Amino acid sequence: MQLFNKILIAVDLSHLEGAKKAVKTALAMTEDRPDAVLRIVSIVPPLENSFVSSLLPRNFDKDVLAEANKRLHDFTQENFPADRKVQHIVAHGTVYEEINTIAQEKEVDLIIMMATKPGKPGLSSNTVKVARFSEKPILILR
């Protein structure tokens, strides 16, 4: 059985139940390895160049990223034991591209993510694209 010591947990902060399930899975998989590094990532998708985006304040993206970072830190504080090594990553861009780029850059052993939003059948388009284009193993949860 392969041991995973560097896990990337991709979460959607607007669906916390799925995020909690992904975290519990990663913690269970590394239960006997407290030195394993768990990287939790949340991706803020870009606003399309549209009429709506032209109405937003100049630093709107920075404010959104700062809020996402705060929410991710709050989430990890509530859902990870204090003694676990957790790295927080908030990225801005196309979800599947950012997840795959981060997985490569951080040389993770495994990506954990949810299949789709709660109550939806099948796989989300981002999950499919992460699986299709990633060079890393992926654990997709329902």
Locations of regions flagged by a protein language model:
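Structural beta-alpha unit
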Residues: 1-2, 78-111
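Small/aliphatic-rich secondary-structure junction motif
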Residues: 2-54
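Solvent-exposed polar/charged
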Residues: 31, 104, 132-133
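General small-molecule cofactor/ligand-binding pocket signal
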Residues: 39-41, 87-91, 139
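A short acidic, glycine-rich active-site loop
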Residues: 58-70
